[in-house]
Amino acid sequence: MKVLIVDDDKLARKGLVAIMDWEKYGFEVVGDVQNGRKALEFLRNHPVDIVFTDIDMPEIDGLELMQMCGEEFPEIKFVILSVYENFSYAQTAIRMGALDYISKISFSPEECGTILERVSEKYLSLIHISE
């Protein structure tokens, strides 16, 4: 599964790439960009299965990115990353079809495997259902 990371916080973006054992769970990080506009440019030129995106970003935020991709790239799935623990953000993201909503505040390195396993299972079950 090819993954794109989208976050305006460079340290968070690079840290997420480094801290997770992506390959163990069948993921390959194919890129990381700093905002939704850059994400759209990347998606138009590279195959991606799942986008891990922050919500609050300049230009195009994570929820807007989800909406725009739903029209242009309906096969791409999303995982939302956010410092907001506000339930309404999570609820909106899930209603829009996000595979998961991960709080950056309560996120710990110990959870990485659990998160990737959960996302992988959800993604693969959706792909299996659509076949």
Features from the language model and the residues they span:
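Active-site residues of response regulator receiver
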Residues: 7, 54
